[in-house]
């Protein structure tokens, strides 16, 4: 019998996510240990504590899960952890702050699936607008969509400065171009007129696009909404919709929070299982989540 799997869950916040704890246990992990209030400067020592305390042949039976609410910080922590390791003491690392990496990946993969059903292969060249882009899910969803070839605009309702820094950060890290827009004083109609794909990543229970906003669209194809709490983030999108026509824009289809969540759940479960069963240490970020999401969503053609 192999050594029990130990998952060390770190977060800069006051508590780790109960959602992530439940996911880890349901994926079969024996021991889950939370560490709160962790700063990036502490990650190297924590990683080396975790890897040096096990026989090298059991190093791969040890994992580090990085939570929090800040994507850039989680990616920095992931980088520090990976650089702290060397053979044969390598442990696995999985970054998914606030579930943002797996949720954003599931969202974009579900949109790609909906586009395929409409006869469109991928996001390349499409006008993609992210509403609620100030949040961690919205930023990563925009980044993934840009990497997939979309012409992405991060839309803020608090001034363009609320998303400009994020756009510049992701541009430096990944070489993508993310445009920014502000709707705090209007302008949604002009944006929606050219929108082909909308990713609604607003706060729970907040409607970011009304029926009137949708009616302004002239070439809209797919709208995805991660808000599962009434009222809907996008008027007319039901939580279980997976390609249902929009009442205010019948030529476009909607994808609801539960349809996205179904893919997100499977992606996170899959990656947690891979940490345990591969036999070698792995490191997962949003790009690995996207690879898994495309495979999982593709099975639902």
Locate each region found by the language model.
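N-terminal ligand-binding/catalytic initiation module
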Residues: 1-89, 287-301
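Adenosine-phosphate binding glycine-rich loop
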Residues: 2-3, 229-301
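Conserved active-site and cofactor/substrate-binding residues in soluble primary-metabolism enzymes
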Residues: 38-41, 72-76, 102, 106, ...
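Glycine/charged-rich beta-loop-alpha catalytic/anionic-binding loops adjacent to active sites
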Residues: 86-94, 124, 249-251
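A glycine-rich, Thr/Ser-enriched phosphate-binding loop motif common to dinucleotide/cofactor-binding enzymes
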Residues: 95-113
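Glycine-rich phosphate/diphosphate-binding loop of Rossmann-like nucleotide-binding domains
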Residues: 113-197
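Rossmann-like adenosine-cofactor binding region
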Residues: 176-254
């Amino acid at each position: 019998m192999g050594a029990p799997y130990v998952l060390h869950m770190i977060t800069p916040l006051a508590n780790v996510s109960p959602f992530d704890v439940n996911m880890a246990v349901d994926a079969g992990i024996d021991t889950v240990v939370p560490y709160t209030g962790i700063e990036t400067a502490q990650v190297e020592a924590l990683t080396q504590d975790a890897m040096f305390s096990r026989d090298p042949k059991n190093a791969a039976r040890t994992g580090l899960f990085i939570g929090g609410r800040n994507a850039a910080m989680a990616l920095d922590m992931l980088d520090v952890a990976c650089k702290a390791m060397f053979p044969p003491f390598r442990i696995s690392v999985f970054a998914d702050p606030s579930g943002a990496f797996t949720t954003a990946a599931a969202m974009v993969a579900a949109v790609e699936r909906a586009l395929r059903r409409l006869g469109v292969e991928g996001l390349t060249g499409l006008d993609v607008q992210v509403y609620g882009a100030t949040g961690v899910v919205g930023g990563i969803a925009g980044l993934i969509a840009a990497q997939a070839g979309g012409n992405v605009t991060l839309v803020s309702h608090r001034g363009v400065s609320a998303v400009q820094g994020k756009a510049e950060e992701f541009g430096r890290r990944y070489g993508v171009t993310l445009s920014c827009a502000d709707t705090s004083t209007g302008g949604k109609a002009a944006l929606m007129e050219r929108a082909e794909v909308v990713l609604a990543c607003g706060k729970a229970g907040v409607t970011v696009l009304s029926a009137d906003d949708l009616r302004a669209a002239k070439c809209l194809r797919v709208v995805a909404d991660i808000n599962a709490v009434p009222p809907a983030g996008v008027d007319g999108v039901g939580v279980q919709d997976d390609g249902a026509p929009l009442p205010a824009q019948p030529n476009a289809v909607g994808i609801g929070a539960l349809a996205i969540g179904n893919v997100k759940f499977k992606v996170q479960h899959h990656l947690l299982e891979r940490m345990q069963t591969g036999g070698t240490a792995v490191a997962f970020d949003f790009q690995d989540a996207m690879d898994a999401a495309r495979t999982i969503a593709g099975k639902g053609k």
